[in-house]
Amino acid sequence: MTYRYVIAAMVLAFSLVPDVSLAQVNVTGTWQPKNWTLRISLRQEGTRVWGFGGQQDFWFRGQWDGDRLVLVANNFQEKRKNTCKARGVFTLSGKTVSLLDGVWFQSDTGRTLKGPWVRLSPDAGAAVQYPYATELMYCGTLQTYELAFASGSDVLQGTDWPILAAVADLLKKDGALTIDVAGHTDSTGDAKANQALSERRAAAVKQALVTKYGADPARITSKGWGAEQPIQDNGTVDGRAMNRRVEIVRAR
């Protein structure tokens, strides 16, 4: 079955459940969004979350950012080796593991849909690896919400980053491939400080690709954009969570 969506950006903001701590949250399982016909399998390890919908046509990946789960959604149809049919960014703000009640917005059409995601089962099925290389080659950009920085810091949290391992492996396999690493912040605080921070974060991602995963530094550029290129409204908490990102862009 083929799922066809035309989505430029999505926001999914969920209500908080105050008696459940963030440390207890794990969204691993099979989910049914009210407004979709396909079921979604999500898997969580630490703060990283990834999964798919349907027959692995629609993919999700991201990470908890405070009390919000920022996810990228792609419908690049890996099995059919097709180009991207949908891209989106979700912000989930929820501390329940059975019902996520919220709203998602299609910015290309202006349509807003409300309704819950219900977890049908804590079983996500067989483990699958997220196809980062396919997304980069067919979509052109990886918004790396899996890479976490403390507020105001340019130090990558954690010690292993599957998304960077996949990008480095792709660079080794494709000798003609070059990439740009672009850092972005939200608009909170001083513009000059945000610009400098975005540059340092982009440089940190490049450094991790080179020193940990053996990528060729000559084929990677890094640049910071500060708050100049938001993808959502900086006037909202959800929008700011999506705007804080590092992107890996296929340069050729």
Place the predicted regions along the sequence by residue.
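Sec/Tat signal peptide C-region and signal peptidase I cleavage site
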Residues: 17-23
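Bacterial N-terminal signal peptides
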Residues: 8-17
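Central antiparallel beta-sheet cores of small beta-barrel/beta-sandwich binding domains
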Residues: 24-96, 101-104
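Extracytoplasmic/secreted envelope proteins and their assembly/folding machinery
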Residues: 28, 161, 165-168, 194, ...
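A mature extracytoplasmic/lumenal domain signature
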Residues: 46, 55, 64, 73-77, ...
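Bacterial N-terminal signal peptides that target proteins for export
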Residues: 1-8
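Periplasmic peptidoglycan-binding/tethering modules of Gram-negative envelope proteins
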Residues: 92-178, 211, 252
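Periplasmic OmpA-like peptidoglycan-binding domain that tethers envelope proteins to the cell wall
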Residues: 182-252
